[in-house]
Amino acid sequence: MTKYIKLFLRLAVSTAMLSAVADRFGLWAAKISVWGNMDNFLQYTQSLLPYFPTSLANAGGWIATLLEMVFSVCLLLGFKTELVAKLSGALIACFGLAMFTSVGLKATFDYSVWNAVGACLAISCLKEKHWEIDSVIK
């Protein structure tokens, strides 16, 4: 049963991250988008990191987006699952800490940040492999 739980968590976390990335690149319809384009996302990133210079906040936004793309594909495929799940949890926790320090604790709950961190940590703890490249590559 745990292999199905892990598979579900991998799918849930990876598709959520890919959806957020798709939103940043305007791949979702405008009426359902949060940001709609990368410029809006970078402005949002700047609001979460007001103590950073704009150029550094923008770099952070791009780096986070790149990491989310890589991590979500790895989780989806089950490649280096334990490591990538821990890294994903750390990345999302950084997002949560930035939200907490800039807009408050409630926003982290509204965006289910800590649920996502918990899901990532759970993935990293579940050792049984199911539909993972890791089970083929040793």
Give the residues covered by each predicted segment.
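A glycine-rich, hydrophobic loop/mini-helix early in the fold
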Residues: 38-45
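Extended, low-polarity transmembrane helix blocks
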Residues: 1-35, 47-66, 70, 77-138
